[in-house]
Design a protein with these regions (language model features):
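Single conserved hydrophobic/aromatic residue that forms the stacking wall/gate
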Residues: 1-13
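Short, solvent-exposed loop/turn segments at the edges of secondary structure
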Residues: 6, 17-22, 87-88
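Non-catalytic carbohydrate-binding regions of carbohydrate-active enzymes
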Residues: 7-10, 32-152, 159-163
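His/Glu-based metal-binding/catalytic segments typifying zinc-dependent metallopeptidases
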Residues: 14-34
Length: 163
């Protein structure tokens, strides 16, 4: 990445921290070198990671709204401004394993616990559409969201390759 594209203070892409950046680390082919991938992962871990998924916007960014509540227009705004999406956790975990390999397994397993706990709360063996971006990370939106369940299953399959 060209230096002028990076924020000097945090060394991240453009001016807000969003989960899109994790795809550049998770995919097989990336324009980033290993050091850049680790920087992206470190920022995502520090600013976006929750026990229920990745936030759609860092709490340090302007316009952060972690609570999916209120009238439809207010919920629509919060949807991309700080709520946590479980399906993004799959790509985050894949990125984490690309950087840390076997030494990252215990961390990934601990992260899955936050999602595993939810499988009996809203809809048996399913996960809600999203969670509030701040504690207590309340499940919101659709009570059962296939994309979230699919990503957890994909990560479990990926983890099985290590055992």
């Amino acid at each position: 990445l060209h230096p002028r594209v990076r924020r000097q203070r945090q060394m991240c892409i453009r001016d807000s921290v969003r989960p899109n950046m994790i795809f550049a680390v998770a995919f097989d082919y990336s324009p980033l070198d290993r050091a850049q991938k680790k920087q992206v992962l470190d920022i995502a871990t520090k600013e976006l990671l929750t026990p229920k998924g990745l936030r759609t916007l860092s709490p340090k960014s302007g316009g952060y709204n972690p609570n999916y509540v209120g009238p439809q227009i207010q919920r629509d705004y919060a949807y991309h401004q700080g709520t946590a999406w479980p399906w993004l956790m799959g790509f985050y975990m894949e990125a984490y394993l690309r950087i840390y390999k076997m030494s990252g397994l215990s961390f990934i397993e601990r992260q899955l616990i936050g999602l595993e706990d939810e499988l009996t709360i809203h809809c048996i063996s399913s996960l809600p559409e999203l969670f509030d971006g701040n504690p207590p990370f309340k499940g919101r939106g659709a009570v059962s969201f296939a994309m979230n369940v699919a990503e957890v299953l994909r990560i479990l399959k990926l983890l099985s390759k290590y055992y």
